[in-house]
UniProtKB/Swiss-Prot annotation:
Gene3D superfamilies: Mur ligase, C-terminal domain (3.90.190.20), Mur-like, catalytic domain (3.40.1190.10), NAD(P)-binding Rossmann-like Domain (3.40.50.720). GO terms for biological process: cell division; cell wall organization; peptidoglycan biosynthetic process; regulation of cell shape. GO terms for molecular function: ATP binding; UDP-N-acetylmuramate-L-alanine ligase activity. Keywords: ATP-binding, Cell cycle, Cell division, Cell shape, Cell wall biogenesis/degradation, Cytoplasm, Ligase, Nucleotide-binding, Peptidoglycan synthesis. The keyword Cell wall biogenesis/degradation applies. This is UDP-N-acetylmuramate--L-alanine ligase. Its EC number is 6.3.2.8. ATP binds at G120, T121, H122, G123, K124, T125, T126. It comes from Acetivibrio thermocellus (strain ATCC 27405 / DSM 1237 / JCM 9322 / NBRC 103400 / NCIMB 10682 / NRRL B-4536 / VPI 7372) (Clostridium thermocellum). GO terms for cellular component: cytoplasm. Its main location: cytoplasm. It is found in: Cytoplasm.
């Protein structure tokens, strides 16, 4: 298929998305609808996302069937869709052009002269959201594509003008190599997605290829605190901007850091050791200072004023599933977080600990068998800042259970490291356990990239709390 004609509504009038209920796919569907395409899509189950798309005029099919693609001129699919999917298989047998999600996102990015791609093992969604709010405060009218729901834009996608585009850039299966960034942010590089990558060197090489996509007049915004990030900056022929909390050589840094009773950080921003402004964040944790510095560096390079940068960051109150307050029952606060990598867990729990709760209860749902198996030792040491860990069954996502790893093993490993941990397989049992044991003033965190957030929702719905003496 001719790549330049992908976004021509005269050539491909009807685009069908397999897995349209996914956070990225739904956003891309909205963008194509806005560009004048007829859009349809299918998913295995209906959701709030698919309902929202239907209201916008997108035809949604529940379940996958050959019939769903009968009018399609182009079929878009995700990495999670297998080759034997009936819709994908039928499209190929009929000669209907097919396209993976990352290629489509890259082609959309091509349309914008100033495209920002935010990469890193952790912090992508938060940083993309921060950058988006700063650009909105700066009246740049960006088109935004986020891997989470941001209340300020009413979801995960915003259609703006044809100049600025902001999106996350995920390294899984090297999909970000299909992007066309003018400015690339690299927040950190750690071992993850080991069902695809061989080792950390393989991952670093993918990030190196990614930042080499930036043109000579473009920018790479890189974390100077991360040695893996620093190691790939050699032989990159574009403007390099660094940020960091612990590196004296970073261009953008922070000092006078303090935290209020909610764990929200206040700090002074420095550029080349010169004090620029003071920021008061409305999200907890020192890791969010680093995300804020990355956002400041990126937006300043794009010409945003310090005044608008400050306004944007101070208006950011978080996104859904990132330390999201779900509710309070019997003076027990329930928070949900997307953390599913050891470093993310550590950062989230460190932020939670700064809130001075009597006890922190962490309900963790491991995400994928390969990640749990390969990072088992790191996971077992990641819960130092919680009082009790409840491990539920592994969320398989795209994988099959080979029997090599189980949540019981992780719970045992955590106990071996001196932490109080138990394995409870079902959500109902976890809710009953929390009702009997959590006390007023405590914090409950549901944590993981699957559906563990339902535990918190079930806990809050059940008003029959058991009194704890």
């Amino acid at each position: 298929m001719e790549q330049l004609s992908i976004l021509d509504p005269n050539k491909f009038k009807h685009v069908h998305f397999i897995g349209i209920g996914g956070i990225s796919m739904s956003g891309l569907a909205e963008i194509l609808l806005n560009l004048g395409f007829t859009v349809s899509g299918s998913d295995i189950r209906s959701s709030n996302i698919t309902s929202k798309l239907e209201k916008k005029g997108i035809k949604i099919y529940t379940g996958h069937s050959e019939e769903n693609i009968k009018d399609a001129d182009l079929v878009v699919y995700t990495a999670a869709v297998k080759s034997d999917n009936p819709e994908l298989a039928k499209a190929k047998s009929l000669g209907i052009p097919t396209l993976d999600r990352a290629t489509l996102l890259g082609e959309i990015m091509k349309k914008y002269p100033f495209s920002v791609a935010v990469s890193g093992t952790h912090g992508k969604t938060t940083t993309t959201s921060m950058i988006s709010l700063i650009m909105l405060k700066s009246a740049l009218d960006p088109t935004i594509h986020i891997g989470g729901e941001l209340d300020a834009i009413g979801g995960n996608t915003r259609i703006g003008s044809n100049k600025y585009f902001v999106a996350e850039a995920c390294e899984y299966v090297e999909s970000f190599l299909k992007f066309h960034p003018y400015l690339a942010v690299v927040l950190n590089i750690e071992a993850d997605h080991l069902d695809y990558f061989k080792d950390i060197e393989h991952i670093k090489n993918a990030f190196l290829k990614f930042i080499r996509l930036v043109p000579e007049n473009g920018y790479v915004v890189a974390c100077a605190d991360d040695q893996n990030v620093l190691s790939i900056l050699k032989d990159v022929h574009c403007n390099i901007i660094t940020f960091g909390l612990n590196s004296k050589n970073a261009m953008w840094t922070a000092e006078d850091i303090s935290f209020n009773e909610n764990g929200f950080a206040a700090f002074t921003v420095l550029k080349d050791n010169e004090r620029i402004t003071n920021i008061q964040l409305k999200v907890p944790g020192i890791h969010n200072i680093s995300n804020a510095l990355a956002s400041i560096a990126a937006c300043y390079a794009l010409g945003c004023s310090i005044e608008n940068i400050k306004k944007g960051l101070e208006s950011y109150t978080g996104i859904h599933r990132r330390f999201e307050l779900k509710g309070i029952e019997n003076n027990i606060k329930v928070v949900d977080d997307y953390a599913h990598h050891p470093s993310e867990i550590k950062a989230t729990l460190k932020a939670a600990r700064s809130g001075n709760y009597p006890r922190i209860w962490t309900v963790f749902q491991p995400h994928t068998y390969t990640r749990t198996k390969f990072l088992l030792d790191e996971f077992s040491k990641a819960f130092k800042d919680t009082d009790k860990v409840i491990i539920t069954d592994i969320y398989s996502a795209r994988e099959k259970d080979t029997g090599e790893i189980h949540s019981r093993i992780l719970a045992e490993k955590i106990r071996e490291n001196g932490q109080d941990a138990i394995y409870l397989p079902d959500f109902e049992g976890i809710v009953e356990y929390l009702k009997k044991n959590a006390s007023p003033g405590d914090l409950i965190i549901t944590m993981g990239a699957g559906d563990v957030y339902k535990v918190g929702e079930m806990f809050l719905k059940d008003k029959q709390m058991v009194a704890v003496s």
